Amino acid sequence: MARLKVTQINSGIGRKQNQRETLRSLGLHKIGQSVVKDDKPEFRGMVNTVSHLVTVEEVD
């Protein structure tokens, strides 16, 4: 299964509550922090919710 590396590039301050909660659910707390997760539909949905706050790249 493919894995995705998600990096937070913008702050969640001043964003809607669901976007802030999604960042926390992804395990992101600081700008520049990255997490690597399995590529699942649930994960993709969370990334789409905060796509303007994160970057995504595939990792092997």
Curated annotation (Swiss-Prot):
Q: Which PROSITE patterns match?
A: RIBOSOMAL_L30 (PS00634)
The alphabetized list of GO BP terms reads: translation
- One Pfam family assigned to this protein is Ribosomal_L30
CDD domains linked: Ribosomal_L30
* GO cellular component entries: cytosolic large ribosomal subunit
Q: Which terms are listed as keywords in the entry?
A: Ribonucleoprotein, Ribosomal protein
Matching entries from InterPro entries are given as: Ribo_uL30_ferredoxin-like_sf (IPR036919), Ribosomal_uL30_bac-type (IPR005996), Ribosomal_uL30_CS (IPR018038), Ribosomal_uL30_ferredoxin-like (IPR016082)
Gene Ontology MF terms in the entry: structural constituent of ribosome
Say which family it is in. Answer: Belongs to the universal ribosomal protein uL30 family.
Q: How does it assemble?
A: Part of the 50S ribosomal subunit.
UniProt-recorded name of the protein: Large ribosomal subunit protein uL30
The gene for this chain is: rpmD
